[in-house]
Swiss-Prot record:
Binds 1 [4Fe-4S] cluster. It catalyses: 5,6,7,8-tetrahydrosarcinapterin + methyl-Co(III)-[corrinoid Fe-S protein] = 5-methyltetrahydrosarcinapterin + Co(I)-[corrinoid Fe-S protein] + H(+). Its cofactor is corrinoid; [4Fe-4S] cluster. Heterodimer of delta and gamma chains. The ACDS complex is made up of alpha, epsilon, beta, gamma and delta chains with a probable stoichiometry of (alpha(2)epsilon(2))(4)-beta(8)-(gamma(1)delta(1))(8). Keywords: 4Fe-4S, Cobalt, Iron, Iron-sulfur, Metal-binding, Methanogenesis, Methyltransferase, Transferase. It comes from Methanosarcina mazei (strain ATCC BAA-159 / DSM 3647 / Goe1 / Go1 / JCM 11833 / OCM 88) (Methanosarcina frisia). One of its GO terms (biological process) is acetyl-CoA catabolic process. Its EC number is 2.1.1.245. The gene is cdhE1. One of its GO terms (molecular function) is 4 iron, 4 sulfur cluster binding. This is Acetyl-CoA decarbonylase/synthase complex subunit gamma 1. [4Fe-4S] cluster binds at C18, C21, C26, C43. Gene3D superfamilies: 3.40.50.11600, Dihydropteroate synthase-like.
């Protein structure tokens, strides 16, 4: 993005404040363009009226991310990679979380392919209010046989809606896979210095994204990318090679940094998403599969943090996948807006009029920790999430985001009446918000009980203190 102020975007807008975009003013809409919560297509006059055509084209150019965004696959599960504007998250945010593709090989028997594909497709890990998923399937042409590869590709796409990567350096094999995967927008892996012409022709013929590959040769990689761009191929992914150990790993790390820095600083010839291959850990001579999985996870972690936009992985063991998906979720959390849940009254279990009423803040990690501690111990209760702008209990109580007035307002907005909806007219407050006890009692005219400092101690606290003494 070449502009960073709403004022700069505003001058390319109709400036009529028509409200058709859903914003009250064109300046407000300009703000959504800068923070990337809105798109130029959200402004009907800008799109429909010919007099704005030049302004629209220039605005689109100025708003385009420094790193090109590439889409793999189709439909709801299509994977967007790239699209970043900064080297460091705190300067804006990172967009398009690192996509994780897990491999299958065409020399596996059909039942094994189907089983692995279903395992990849069905993977789900609940974390802070959302399900973490895997992103796609990389189909390796281990046989180097076009017919066998086509059969494997057909079997994969019949059993998943996830996007796929077709992996071979043999153009004939890739063509066989493309014929089967027509309309699925697969990613081609890969074009190198030996096959670039044939693979480039395939990318143009089938209109699919393609990886250009030059191991530890950034000049060669840039030349390939430039050649493909000049040929009219826009959706390019860079593979500088991923060496799993020693000096090769150090060089790989440095190459990722150089590529991304050059792209962000304006070198459009190499401003494309980067592919990492942590599965090379399995080629590092590590005999023990657990140790190989561990090292693969280490590599995945390194390149999630340092600009890997898409990864090819092998191990599906929980001890490998859980750190990988958790880290990606954490790194790609938007620092401009803390992860928060809706501020409202939630039911935990099957509460009744005799069940306890508690509150916490709407910071997602806090809320789901408390909710989990209550639910896992079979405590049926009412749990209110107070709007603290996504800040945890202790910080919100200290900073003024959690006050007696805020708690009262949250109860009123939730429609929950402590006098009629429960029989005990009591509220349990977090131990870290104990300073608010008196104020809450005055504001709500209820009995306030100070709970433990840690929600993990709630079961023991409930045994001793609930129901409240009359």
């Amino acid at each position: 993005m070449k502009i960073n102020s709403p004022l700069e975007a505003y001058k390319y807008l109709p400036q009529t404040n028509c409200g058709e975009c859903g914003q009250p003013t064109c300046m407000a809409f300009a703000s959504t363009l800068i923070d990337r919560s809105g798109k130029t297509t959200d402004c009907p006059p800008l799109i429909k009226e010919k007099k704005f055509a030049k302004k629209l084209a220039e605005l689109d150019r100025l708003l385009a991310p420094e790193i090109r965004q590439v889409t793999i696959g189709v439909g709801e599960r299509a994977a967007n990679i790239g699209g970043d504007d900064v080297l460091y998250r705190h300067k804006l945010t990172f967009f398009n979380k690192t996509k994780m593709f897990f491999d299958v090989a065409d020399n596996m028997d059909e039942a094994a392919i189907v089983e692995r594909v279903k395992k990849i497709s069905d993977y789900k890990k609940f974390y802070v209010g959302r399900n973490l998923l895997l992103d796609g399937v990389a189909i390796r042409a281990a046989s180097n046989d076009p017919a066998k590869f086509a059969t494997a590709v057909k079997k994969v796409i019949e059993n998943t809606e996830l996007p796929v990567i077709l992996c071979s350096f043999n153009p004939a094999v890739l063509k066989a896979g493309l014929e089967v995967a027509k309309g699925k927008n697969p990613l081609l892996y890969a074009a190198n210095k030996d096959n670039w012409k044939e693979v480039g022709e395939l990318a143009l013929e089938y209109n699919v994204p393609v990886v250009v590959s030059a191991f530890n040769d950034l000049d060669g990689l840039k030349t390939l990318a430039k050649t493909f761009a000049e040929a009219g191929i826009k959706d390019i992914v860079l593979d500088p090679g991923t060496y799993p150990t020693g000096k090769g790993l150090k060089d790989t790390f440095t190459n990722f940094l150089k590529i991304r820095r050059a792209g962000i600083m304006g070198d459009t010839e190499i401003a494309y998403p980067i592919m990492a291959m942590p599965l090379t850990a399995w080629m590092a001579g590590i005999a023990d599969p657990v140790s190989a999985s561990y090292w693969e996870t280490v590599l995945a972690s390194i390149f999630t943090i340092r600009y890997g936009d898409i990864m090819l992985l092998h191990s599906m063991e929980p001890y490998a996948t859980m750190p990988e998906v958790h880290l990606a979720e954490t790194i790609y959390t938007d620092p401009r807006s803390p992860v928060a849940v809706d501020s409202k009254m939630y039911k935990v279990g099957n509460p009744t009029a005799d069940s306890p009423v508690l509150f916490t803040t709407n910071f997602a990690l806090t809320y789901y920790t408390v909710e989990s501690d209550l639910a896992s111990n079979g405590i049926d209760c009412w749990l209110l999430a107070v709007n603290t702008d996504g800040i945890g209990v202790e910080a919100a109580a200290a900073g003024g985001q959690l006050t007696a007035d805020k708690v009262k307002d949250a109860f009123e907005k939730s429609g929950f009446d402590l006098k009629s909806d429960v029989t005990h007219n009591s509220v349990v407050i977090p131990g870290l918000a104990a300073r608010l006890q008196g104020d809450i009692e005055d504001k709500l005219n209820v009995k306030v009980m100070v709970g433990p400092m840690d929600s993990g101690r709630l079961p023991g606290w409930m045994e001793k203190n609930w129901p409240p003494k009359k």
